[in-house]
């Protein structure tokens, strides 16, 4: 990948992660667990579900903030360091993107078949309040193109790093 293309990818990813972080932080600052549970009806059924959901969102926020800060460092350097930038993009894929699509609390899941039809591909385990549904679906519309752009970092980047290590050993 050329340095120009890599830098452009870092800039685009930085912008998207910053947008995601702002949206998630705004939501988390406005809601409480008690408020979500009371808006949903049955407290016993929804308290654990929303607790997991909020925990996943807080983790996602931390991962995205860390990643966009590291991308910012990479982009501000006087000389663009390609290896560092690739490492950060790898971490974006494996922390931010994977944690969005595979949340630890399993509060929703992705149905990849729906993505090809142009429909929202997130399926919620329980009916959530409209604001949370809107946030999650909005995030998926930002994460989906980012995931496609960073697909290289799922497996090919690791293979490249392993080949480089083997060359240095030989």
Which functions belong to the PLM regions below?
Residues 1-170:
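Long, low-complexity or tandemly repetitive, helically biased scaffold regions used
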């Amino acid at each position: 990948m050329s340095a120009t293309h890599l830098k452009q990818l870092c800039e685009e990813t930085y912008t998207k992660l910053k947008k995601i972080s702002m949206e998630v932080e705004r939501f988390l600052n406005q809601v409480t667990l008690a408020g979500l549970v009371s808006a949903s009806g049955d407290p016993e059924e929804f308290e654990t579900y929303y607790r997991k959901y909020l925990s996943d969102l807080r983790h996602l926020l931390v991962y995205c903030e860390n990643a966009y800060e590291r991308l910012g460092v990479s982009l501000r350097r006087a000389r663009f360091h390609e290896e560092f930038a690739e490492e950060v993009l790898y971490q974006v894929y494996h922390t931010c993107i994977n944690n969005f699509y595979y949340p630890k609390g399993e509060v929703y899941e992705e149905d990849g078949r729906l993505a090809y039809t142009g429909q929202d591909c997130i399926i919620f385990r329980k009916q959530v309040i409209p604001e949370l549904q809107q946030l999650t679906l909005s995030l998926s519309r930002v994460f989906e193109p980012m995931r496609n752009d960073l697909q290289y970092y799922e497996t090919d980047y690791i293979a490249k790093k392993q080949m480089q290590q083997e060359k240095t050993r030989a």
